[in-house]
Amino acid sequence: MKKIIVTGCNGQLGRAINKQYANSDSYMLVNTDVGVEGVTKLDITDINQVMKFVEEQKPYAIINCAAHTNVDACERQVDAAYRINALGPRNLSIAATKVGAKLMHISTDYVFAGNAETPRIEFDQVAPQGVYGATKLAGENFVREFAKDHFIIRTAWLYGDGKNFVKTMLRLAETNSEVKVVKDQLGTPTSATELAK
């Protein structure tokens, strides 16, 4: 049975991964988060804590779903955003490489400029427009630099358990005859359940 550490297990994707693989005969999930009752506390911004935990667990893989995802709050909490979105992935990368684990890092389309008229592809030029995108890109760069065996997945408009754009639109459509939203954004809603598979 392959052991997989899932960081950020209380987020939309982390919960979807747990639903998908909790009863698997092939994988044993080790769920981590901060401030979540019933799961192992792991502060990915603390390199010593990460190294100790990963060396003890000796996982086959680490799936990093942990992130500071509140885009507006990132603009006000720049240091916290950088620690979680950039240094956290760096720490996980170093630890994964030390124990020979694969690292799957979840990133975002916010690493691109917001002016595309067609869907993005992985080779498009990155040009983040805010703190959230810049810190996620810094995290990607650390993963590339420090993780020997890694995958970076850029997702957008994730929806699943929890707050998200799709649920907000459905709720507003039920209670309002008219819903006003920005019309200058292009995105692809992504099912957390499908991504977890």
Describe the residue ranges of each PLM region.
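Catalytic helix-loop patch of NAD(P)-dependent Rossmann-fold dehydrogenases
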Residues: 83, 87-91, 111-153, 157-158
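NAD(P)H-binding glycine-rich loop region in Rossmannoid oxidoreductase-like domains
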Residues: 44-84
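SDR active-site strand-loop-helix element
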Residues: 7, 32, 62-66, 103-108, ...
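Conserved catalytic-core motifs of eukaryotic protein kinase domains, centered on the activation segment
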Residues: 72-79, 114-118, 163
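NAD(P)-dependent short-chain dehydrogenase/reductase
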Residues: 141-189, 193-194
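Rossmann-fold cofactor-recognition segment
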Residues: 34-48
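N-terminal Rossmann NAD(P)H-binding glycine-rich loop of SDR-like oxidoreductase domains
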Residues: 2-24
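NAD(P)-cofactor binding segment of oxidoreductase domains
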Residues: 76-104
